[in-house]
């Protein structure tokens, strides 16, 4: 089990790295073209009761960056924090060359965890409650069945982990992947003895041998990284430059006096 200070300091280190990566991405955005959906803009303008182009650009940039933040944070957890803080073995491209992990049934497995007592657990990491759809749930059930039947020497059990939220909030797809049918009868095998689903606090506790405070320690590391990096001091200026460049690019094509010319914007983007 990892102790509090070990987790906090390690998470802080990788969170600092990630914060600098996000800053670098923002700097790169200044010289890139942001994709804008001209058909969506009138809806956003009306739905959010926006008053001018500046407010619309603020909304577009926030949405654009939020997608990158969410994706980047998922990679931070998956590729940096789990392997480097909690000692999991990430099934990267090199690891997947090793038998039996080169077989297709392991495609949705992200980590191998070898516990202190020698137990081998496989982790399929998911970002949230909506990550799994019906087709994937059925496919996961089939893949997990193959792993448990054909590679019992390589794994003792399988966990599907969701790093935020609660198990009660998950969709029924997380039951289906374990072989539990709710309502409609799907072609799945009961794997409830060997496949578990943990979300939120339960996931972080399971990861760290039952320590209930693990998620607080992870968050503490992130907060300490932010306090030290003070990213807002540079991000504010970069965001202002980004906004100014977007406004300048579209101002003549979207403004028609005091109103917005959506057809001019459509023509600029789509030709």
Can you name each region flagged by the protein language model?
Residues 1-77, 264:
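Interdomain/boundary linker segments immediately adjacent to catalytic/signaling cores
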Residues 1-21, 66, 132-148, 196-206:
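Hydrophobic transmembrane alpha-helix bundles
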Residues 1-8, 106, 113-115, 133, ...:
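Short, structured coil/loop segments at alpha-helix boundaries
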Residues 15-22, 81, 85-90, 144-151, ...:
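Hydrophobic, Leu/Ile/Phe/Ala-enriched alpha-helical segments that form helix-helix packing faces
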Residues 54-55, 60-61, 150-167, 216-225:
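A short, terminal or domain-edge coil/loop segment
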Residues 74-145:
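Catalytic centers of nucleases
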Residues 127-198:
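Catalytic cores of nucleic-acid endonucleases
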Residues 173-271:
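Charged, structured surface patches that assemble and position nucleic-acid processing machinery
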């Amino acid at each position: 089990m990892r102790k509090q200070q070990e987790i906090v300091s390690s998470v802080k280190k990788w969170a600092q790295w990630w914060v600098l990566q996000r800053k670098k991405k923002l700097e790169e955005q200044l010289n890139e073209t942001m994709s804008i959906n001209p058909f969506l803009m009138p809806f956003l303008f009306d739905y959010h009761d926006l008053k001018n182009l500046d407010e619309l650009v603020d909304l577009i940039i926030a949405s654009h960056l939020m997608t990158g933040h969410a994706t980047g944070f998922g990679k931070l957890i998956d590729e940096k924090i789990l392997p480097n803080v909690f000692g999991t073995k990430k099934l990267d491209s090199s690891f997947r060359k090793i038998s039996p992990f080169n077989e297709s049934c392991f495609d949705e497995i992200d980590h191998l965890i070898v516990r202190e007592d020698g137990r081998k657990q496989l982790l399929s990491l998911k970002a949230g409650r909506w990550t799994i759809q019906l087709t994937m749930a059925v496919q996961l059930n089939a893949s997990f069945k193959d792993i448990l039947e054909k590679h019992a020497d390589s794994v003792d059990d399988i966990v599907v982990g969701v790093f935020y939220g609660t198990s009660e909030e998950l969709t029924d797809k997380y039951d289906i992947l374990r072989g539990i049918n709710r309502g409609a009868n799907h072609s799945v095998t009961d794997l409830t003895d060997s496949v578990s689903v943990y979300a939120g606090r339960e996931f972080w506790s399971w990861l760290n041998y039952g320590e209930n405070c693990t998620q607080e320690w992870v968050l503490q590391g992130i907060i300490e990284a932010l306090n030290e990096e003070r990213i807002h001091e540079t991000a504010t200026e970069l965001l202002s430059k980004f906004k100014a460049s977007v406004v300048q690019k579209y101002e003549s094509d979207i403004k028609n006096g005091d109103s917005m010319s959506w057809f001019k914007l459509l023509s600029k983007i789509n030709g």
